[in-house]
């Protein structure tokens, strides 16, 4: 540990992301990436963007992209905030809306970046314990003193919370911001975007990494009433005015516009998810109902860690969490149909040998 580090640096426990192997032969089902490439229109936009004007700074307000997203969701561009991936948007949101002396509430089994942000900003937080079936008890979020964060669908479980439940949480916290993290909403859930008009305290955060196949370009955004977005811009412009580069912005615009390609790819992921669930059930796995591009699975006979290790030996990566209550579960991203057929073949052979 360096003597030059600040106390925060010494004490923080950083987020640990999923393994990113260099071997292209590995079937990668561990970080919830889209198995399909970006829209051809996105790739063409990237090629066209390689021009002389790359020497100039990009638009700090991302006006063209904000207008595109606003039109898509029937909002004004003043209700859209752009960031360098939804992780940055989340980090800025924690700093914008939550106070150190007030307790923020989020689930004990959820995106593990939340406690990292809270500790980084010295926020007090409470972990709301999820039920045994991994559903959320909305009463745990009632009158949160500092605000609340809901992942919907939840990660790593894939469990979806109804809009009526989201409404109740918003109504129970009218004086505090409720962040709804919708990284996986396009794989079967109904977005809380439709609540923005009636609820000034809701901030919806989405990403183009999952359903739009742009994880490599880092584009996230927040949607909310103008006062919330204005606050986010104040914090963003105190860190870095130019969060999105010119090429990423142009690629994102085309990704949003190509609705036909988006629907085709998400439909294939959902279809493959359902097929995989059925196949796993045939060999005794239990699967938590999922509205995401991944599934959360367990088996009464076999240990999740053993299966995880054996799959890795077979060049198939899934995600294992050595944490209380979920240490016998695996999170499996939904790949292409061909990848999931290989996954099924490998996992059948593994459990037959265990």
Curated annotation (Swiss-Prot):
The modification N6-(pyridoxal phosphate)lysine is found at residue 210. One of its GO terms (molecular function) is histidinol-phosphate transaminase activity. Pfam families: Aminotran_1_2 (PF00155). Its cofactor is pyridoxal 5'-phosphate. Its EC number is 2.6.1.9. The keyword Cytoplasm does not apply. Pathway: Amino-acid biosynthesis; L-histidine biosynthesis; L-histidine from 5-phospho-alpha-D-ribose 1-diphosphate: step 7/9. It is an enzyme of class 2 (transferase). It comes from the Bacteria. It catalyses: L-histidinol phosphate + 2-oxoglutarate = 3-(imidazol-4-yl)-2-oxopropyl phosphate + L-glutamate. One of its GO terms (biological process) is L-histidine biosynthetic process. CDD domains: AAT_like. Keywords: Amino-acid biosynthesis, Aminotransferase, Histidine biosynthesis, Pyridoxal phosphate, Transferase. Belongs to the class-II pyridoxal-phosphate-dependent aminotransferase family. Histidinol-phosphate aminotransferase subfamily. Homodimer. This is Histidinol-phosphate aminotransferase. The lineage of its organism: Bacteria, Bacillati, Bacillota, Clostridia, Eubacteriales.
